[in-house]
């Protein structure tokens, strides 16, 4: 393939629509790309590129190993997967928050500053899709926890005795409230990021930088 040919990895699911929208707005025609299609690879001849559709959690791996030159991925996934990639730009969409939550009847007391006292949660079990993020957060608090990795229905874990608390991503908090869980600590905020393979970023620097700058101007991001 030509040196400036780009393979772009996009996530299946809710981030795909926003990702395609911003690419279209910077002149990359991708009308044929659809999650409804059985295809996973979409050639874009005019743009000298192709789009591949991946599971969100796999995108950092595709980019790290060079199967994709660049990718769109949530910061939550980027932190958890901890792959060796170049983070180029905060794209701003797909906002969510990492939080610690517990059943409302088991929340710890509050400290004078209004925050919940987490000290009594040392060595407790934490159900989460993000064990690395959970461990890192509690380690920063000087605590150890036992992460239990689940792939869905995280809110169920405290109700059936699998874990004392959860670490999960939330957008509005509605699911927590419906399951009688209370947010006891914020961890961090996450949005979608543009990432690049390290070798591709050197070899295709001009092309990748051009695309990054067009996205930056579109989204009004500071350099």
Swiss-Prot record:
It catalyses: 1-(5-phospho-beta-D-ribosyl)-ATP + diphosphate = 5-phospho-alpha-D-ribose 1-diphosphate + ATP. Keywords: Amino-acid biosynthesis, ATP-binding, Cytoplasm, Glycosyltransferase, Histidine biosynthesis, Nucleotide-binding, Transferase. Pathway: Amino-acid biosynthesis; L-histidine biosynthesis; L-histidine from 5-phospho-alpha-D-ribose 1-diphosphate: step 1/9. GO terms for molecular function: ATP binding; ATP phosphoribosyltransferase activity. GO terms for biological process: L-histidine biosynthetic process. Its main location: cytoplasm. It holds the Pfam family HisG. It is found in: Cytoplasm. It is an enzyme of class 2 (transferase). Coiled coil: none annotated. Its EC number is 2.4.2.17. InterPro entries: ATP_PRibTrfase_cat (IPR013820), ATP_PRibTrfase_CS (IPR018198), ATP_PRibTrfase_HisG (IPR001348), ATP_PRibTrfase_HisG_short (IPR024893). PROSITE patterns: ATP_P_PHORIBOSYLTR. GO terms for cellular component: cytoplasm. Catalyzes the condensation of ATP and 5-phosphoribose 1-diphosphate to form N'-(5'-phosphoribosyl)-ATP (PR-ATP). Has a crucial role in the pathway because the rate of histidine biosynthesis seems to be controlled primarily by regulation of HisG enzymatic activity. Lacks the C-terminal regulatory region which is replaced by HisZ. Heteromultimer composed of HisG and HisZ subunits. HAMAP family: HisG_Short. Belongs to the ATP phosphoribosyltransferase family. Short subfamily. This is ATP phosphoribosyltransferase. It comes from Desulfitobacterium hafniense (strain DSM 10664 / DCB-2). The gene is hisG.
């Amino acid at each position: 393939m030509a040196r400036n040919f780009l393979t772009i990895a996009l996530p299946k699911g809710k981030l795909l629509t926003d990702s395609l929208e911003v690419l279209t707005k910077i002149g990359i025609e991708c009308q044929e790309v659809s999650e409804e299609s059985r295809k996973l690879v979409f050639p874009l001849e005019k743009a000298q590129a192709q789009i591949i559709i991946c599971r969100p959690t796999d995108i950092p791996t595709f980019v790290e190993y060079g199967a994709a030159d660049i990718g769109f991925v949530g910061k939550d996934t980027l932190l958890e997967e901890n792959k060796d990639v170049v983070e180029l730009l905060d794209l701003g969409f797909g906002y969510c928050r990492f939080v610690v939550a517990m059943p409302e009847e088991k929340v710890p007391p509050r400290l004078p500053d209004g925050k919940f006292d987490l000290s009594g949660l040392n060595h407790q079990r934490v159900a989460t899709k993000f064990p690395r993020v959970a461990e890192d957060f509690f380690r920063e608090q000087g605590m150890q926890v036992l992460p239990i990795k689940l792939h869905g229905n995280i809110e169920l874990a405290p109700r059936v005795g699998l874990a004392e608390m959860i670490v999960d991503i939330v957008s509005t908090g509605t699911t927590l409230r419906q399951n009688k869980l209370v947010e006891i600590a914020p961890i961090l905020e996450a949005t979608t990021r543009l990432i690049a393979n390290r070798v591709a970023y050197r070899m295709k620097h001009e092309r990748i930088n051009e695309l990054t700058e067009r996205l930056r101007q579109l989204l009004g991001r500071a350099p």
